[in-house]
């Protein structure tokens, strides 16, 4: 456990020594701070100079990582050891993008051989759709792709297809359906021509309630309009491991793409779950996405901690959560294409590390994952940055931006990028009472009025942030960015001594929904309901009589 590690009391003592120090003073005294706390990897860079840390902090954090045998645990993951202890599974999403030739054997399975076999089938299928060779039941080319999934079967593909829209096939329109609220699927279907639509049903077990409900609605809509169930074979494909259920649905087994239990949903966009990505972007760009992630994997595996991006970000996060008692972390991308990135990271981070039980089954006496949230930064400035600047919470921020200008939008990117730098500087530097008062007096305000108003114009500053810069939004850079956050989450899970690769917290609500659904559908259930739940069930039934 973190609190039992030999470096932990040293970090506590160090925190007490520097907790009142202000970053603007560090910048003033250390002209090399920005260059020393900056790491470049390929086309991605991290400026972590605007954090409440110094060389001693970093030294102690690296010692903490060594206390946890972080290096050895990184190797254990890459080699296929069963580090998902509660489910007795290996964790090998890294194998999905590996360019190594050294085979990984897992329970007599040749992992890389299996992965590459599925990728080969995905490429062939993707090519057939993109080229127009795969036709619908009236011999029309496919124009619309509907991905039906939820959680990891939805968020990653949605995020990547949105982020890389500039690379997408101009004929293809992408649609993503996850919500079991019928509004979403019906809104999508009403825009579509069944003869030119391809549905991808993404569910490992092919029994996920929300996904199957939406898929059956899509199937009914399609059959009613096409006039024959036999046409399903040309318009529905599955990403699943349940061949029997897929065939019962009407999907040809040759149109089922497999993935494995060593790939968790939130880590699965690199697998067959990414079929929609490959169809939209093409195999060349999908390969670049995989390569970017692979290069980050190699960096994570081999770079020293001092220049290792995932290790640095993970340890800095632990510093705020477990010593400054920060409860929240903001993701602020300054790029319209990255608008879905915050909610993708929400699942990745909170479903992985939102745990309170250690690997040994003990209750953890310290905080783990913060609440992760965010929005596009430029919009957020006009929504909730007020709280970040002048509120009472310490909320570390990841600013994410690209250097590449968008074509045909002269002046836009300069405004956007200037705001990234200005916000990070403002959070770090702040504005003192004396500075605020001087500004007001300079503007000609009455002295007494200026003294009162100046209190409201003080920015304490000392608000920490990272700045992640991509040269441009490209497949390889998005691959590297996602892998960076995956590994950051892993680092923190190791420090906290938790299993980052199960998600038992999603189960209880699903279990309790079963008897409630029986009641709502008019059947009697023997389950016990508390008085509140019972009252609300009756309210629903009475309204819908």
From Swiss-Prot:
Instruction: Quote the catalytic activity from the record.
Output: alpha-D-glucose 6-phosphate = beta-D-fructose 6-phosphate
Q: Which domain of life is it from?
A: Bacteria
UniProtKB keywords:
Cytoplasm, Gluconeogenesis, Glycolysis, Isomerase
Instruction: Report a single Gene Ontology molecular function.
Output: monosaccharide binding
Q: What class of enzyme is it?
A: isomerase
Compartments, record wording = Cytoplasm
Single GO BP term: glucose 6-phosphate metabolic process
Q: Which residues form a coiled coil?
A: none
Q: EC number(s) per UniProt? A: 5.3.1.9
Q: Which Pfam families match?
A: PGI (PF00342)
CC per GO annotation: cytosol
Q: Which InterPro entries match?
A: G6P_Isomerase (IPR001672), G6P_Isomerase_C (IPR023096), Phosphoglucose_isomerase_CS (IPR018189), SIS_dom_sf (IPR046348), SIS_PGI_1 (IPR035476), SIS_PGI_2 (IPR035482)
Active-site residues (renumbered): 351 (proton donor), 382, 510
Q: In which pathway does it act?
A: Carbohydrate biosynthesis; gluconeogenesis; Carbohydrate degradation; glycolysis; D-glyceraldehyde 3-phosphate and glycerone phosphate from D-glucose: step 2/4
Q: What does this protein do?
A: Catalyzes the reversible isomerization of glucose-6-phosphate to fructose-6-phosphate.
Per the record, the similarity remark reads: Belongs to the GPI family.
* NCBIfam families from the UniProt entry: PRK00179.1
Q: What is this protein called?
A: Glucose-6-phosphate isomerase
């Amino acid at each position: 456990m973190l609190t039992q590690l030999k470096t932990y009391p040293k970090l506590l003592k160090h925190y007490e020594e520097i907790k009142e120090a202000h970053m603007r003073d560090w910048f003033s005294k250390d002209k090399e701070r920005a260059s020393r706390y900056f790491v470049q990897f390929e086309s991605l860079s991290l400026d972590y100079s605007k954090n409440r840390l110094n060389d001693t902090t970093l030294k102690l954090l690296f010692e903490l990582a060594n206390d946890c045998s972080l290096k050895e645990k990184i190797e254990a993951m890459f080699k296929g050891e069963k580090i998902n202890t509660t489910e007795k599974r290996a964790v090998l999403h890294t194998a999905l993008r590996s360019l190594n030739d050294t085979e990984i054997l897992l329970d007599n399975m040749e992992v890389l051989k299996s992965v590459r076999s599925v990728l080969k089938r995905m490429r062939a299928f993707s090519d057939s759709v993109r080229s127009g060779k795969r036709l619908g039941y009236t011999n029309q080319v496919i124009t619309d792709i509907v991905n039906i999934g939820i959680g990891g079967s939805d968020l990653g593909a949605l995020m990547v297809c949105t982020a890389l829209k500039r690379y997408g096939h101009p004929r293809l329109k992408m649609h993503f359906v996850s919500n079991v609220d019928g509004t979403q699927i019906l809104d999508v279907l009403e825009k579509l021509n069944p003869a030119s639509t391809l549905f991808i049903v993404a569910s490992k077990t092919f029994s996920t309630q929300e996904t199957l409900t939406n898929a059956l609605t899509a199937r009914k809509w399609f059959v009613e309009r096409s006039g024959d169930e036999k046409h399903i074979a040309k318009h529905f494909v599955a990403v699943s491991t349940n061949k029997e259920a897929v065939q019962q649905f009407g999907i040809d087994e040759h149109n089922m793409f497999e993935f494995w239990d060593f790939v968790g949903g939130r880590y699965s966009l690199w697998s067959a779950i990414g079929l929609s990505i490959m169809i939209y972007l093409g195999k060349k760009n999908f390969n670049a996405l995989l390569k970017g992630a692979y290069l980050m994997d190699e960096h994570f595996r081999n770079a020293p901690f001092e220049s290792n991006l995932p290790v640095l970000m993970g340890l800095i996060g632990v510093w705020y959560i477990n010593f400054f008692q920060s409860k929240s972390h903001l993701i602020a991308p300054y790029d319209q294409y990255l608008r879905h990135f915050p909610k993708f990271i929400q699942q990745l981070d909170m479903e992985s590390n939102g745990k309170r039980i250690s690997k040994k089954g003990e209750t953890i006496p310290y905080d783990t994952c913060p609440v992760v949230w965010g929005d596009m930064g430029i919009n957020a400035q006009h929504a909730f940055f007020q709280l970040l600047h002048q509120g009472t919470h310490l909320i570390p921020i990841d600013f994410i931006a690209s250097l590449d200008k968008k074509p045909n939008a002269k002046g836009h990117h300069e405004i956007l990028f200037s705001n990234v730098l200005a916000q990070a500087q403002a959070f770090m530097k702040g504005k003192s009472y004396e500075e605020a008062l001087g500004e007001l007096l300079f503007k000609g305000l009455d002295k007494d009025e200026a003294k009162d108003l100046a209190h409201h114009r003080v920015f304490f500053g000392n608000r920490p942030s990272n700045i992640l810069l991509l040269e441009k939004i490209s497949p390889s850079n998005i691959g590297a960015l996602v892998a960076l956050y995956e590994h950051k989450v892993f680092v923190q899970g190791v420090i906290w001594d938790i299993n980052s690769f199960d998600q038992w917290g999603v189960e209880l609500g699903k279990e309790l929904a079963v008897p409630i659904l029986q009641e709502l559908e008019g059947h009697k259930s023997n389950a016990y309901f508390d008085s509140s739940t019972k009252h609300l069930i009756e309210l629903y039934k009475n309204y819908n009589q």
